Amino acid sequence: KQATKIDLQGQKMTWSAYDGETSWTRNQMTMEPEKNDSEANKNMKNIAKEWPSPFLNYKEKGFTVELVGKETIDGTETFKIKVTKDPIVRDGQEQPNISHYYFDTENFVPIVQEEEIKEGPMKGQTVKMTLSDYQEVNGLYFPFSQSSQFQSMEFKEFVLNPEVESALFVFPEGK
């Protein structure tokens, strides 16, 4: 299960949720919740396997990991790692789902993640996510700052295995 809650201009809401079978998200224009189609549900099931990291138990997830080489990113020497995950389905066709991570060779944490955009007006272009401000949470390290050319996100906290009401994941009928 997975849910994203946001605070948008002082209004707290569940932006999207996935209960293990069905996913939904809010329409960015109307802010109304909309159920996703079966293709999006299948993709969500695959994407949920990536949490908290595609590297954690990657073999059991069916992912492959390959060292591509070393590269310098903004003056930092990194290991470039290719991760091949479950395919994404778009318009009934499976498409490769590959990410590249750049791990700092001193601290062994990813500082950049690159992925190809699969749909929309930017389809085929690469999005580069910069990961920083790593903090330890229950023995795992999480980047509390993530930024790309499109958006920046600062996280206040990561809570692992919290008690969560199952209603959080349910599509809000009639709202």
PLM features: what roles do these ranges have?
Residues Q9-K12, M31-P33, E119, F150:
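Short, surface-exposed beta-strand-loop junctions and turns on beta-sheet-rich folds
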Residues G10, F55-N57, K156:
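Short, functionally important structural connectors and interaction interfaces within domains
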Residues A17-Q93, G120-K123, T130, V164, ...:
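Flexible, processing/modification-adjacent segments and terminal tails
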Residues D74-P172:
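Gly/Pro-enriched, hydrophobic low-complexity segments
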